[in-house]
């Protein structure tokens, strides 16, 4: 799996991110929103008259952050006295782009259907199409926005900079602690370590 595919897999896995906009007062605003990554864009929806829409009318440039914390790593895993080694392992993706109101009903329906497929994969609803007469007024009424991605950077931090013996010691401690996501963190530490990358596995930025 290459780096771009790994980042896109993370975008498809997560269900919400933080939208950064600039308010009319010049202050930055951050709003958590559900999203879907669909056909190379970030889509989200909401009211046509909400605060987000006011901000976007004033400035279409936005940032969008998706992040997931995996495990907190206590300092004593690697140093018996100093607090400095305490850290956290995580994945994050930062997107810069422009947000546009989607007017085309076919594109809107496609984005909304992608939302449902992601957030309600078990089904239990009629598929959303622009041609469906019952969906048509609802599609028209909701504001769907698309972020056209201009720049995307990812950071997956899992101890890639550590010496092998230190990394293995943390992995052993995580597998023994067994908190939620500890075992997954240990697996990702092995996956992303430079030795595994050199042997043919891809990694993301340290």
Where are these regions (language model features)?
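An N-terminal domain-cap segment
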Residues: 1-43, 47
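Catalytic micro-motifs at enzyme active sites that drive phosphoryl/nucleotidyl and oxygen chemistry
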Residues: 21-25, 52-53, 81-84, 133-134
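C-terminal edge-of-domain segments
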Residues: 103-206
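A structural signal for short, well-ordered beta-strand segments
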Residues: 35, 97-99, 147-149
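Short, structured beta-strand-loop surface elements
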Residues: 49-111
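A general structural signal for short secondary-structure junctions and capping/turn motifs
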Residues: 9, 52-56, 135-142
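Short hydrophobic-aromatic micro-motifs
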Residues: 42-45, 64-66, 95, 145-146, ...
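A generic structural signal for short beta-strands and their flanking turns/coil linkers
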Residues: 15, 31, 38-40, 58-62, ...
């Amino acid at each position: 799996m290459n780096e771009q595919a790994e980042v896109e897999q993370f975008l498809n896995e997560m269900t919400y991110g933080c939208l950064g906009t600039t308010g009319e007062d010049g202050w930055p605003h951050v709003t958590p929103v559900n999203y879907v990554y669909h056909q190379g864009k970030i889509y989200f929806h909401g009211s046509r008259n909400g605060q987000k829409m006011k901000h976007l009318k004033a400035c279409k440039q936005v940032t969008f952050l998706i992040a997931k914390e995996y495990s907190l790593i206590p300092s004593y895993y690697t140093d018996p006295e100093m607090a400095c080694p305490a850290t956290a392992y995580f994945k994050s993706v930062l997107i810069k782009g422009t947000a546009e109101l989607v007017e085309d009903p076919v594109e809107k329906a496609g984005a909304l259907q992608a939302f449902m497929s992601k957030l309600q994969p078990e089904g239990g609803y009629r598929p959303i199409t622009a041609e469906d007469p019952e969906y048509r007024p609802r599609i028209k009424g909701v504001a769907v926005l698309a972020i056209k991605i201009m720049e995307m950077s990812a950071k997956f931090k899992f101890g890639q900079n550590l010496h092998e013996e230190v990394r293995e010691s943390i992995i052993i401690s995580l597998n023994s602690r067994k908190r939620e996501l500890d075992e997954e963190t240990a697996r990702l530490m092995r996956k992303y370590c430079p030795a595994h990358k050199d042997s043919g596995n891809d990694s993301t930025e340290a």
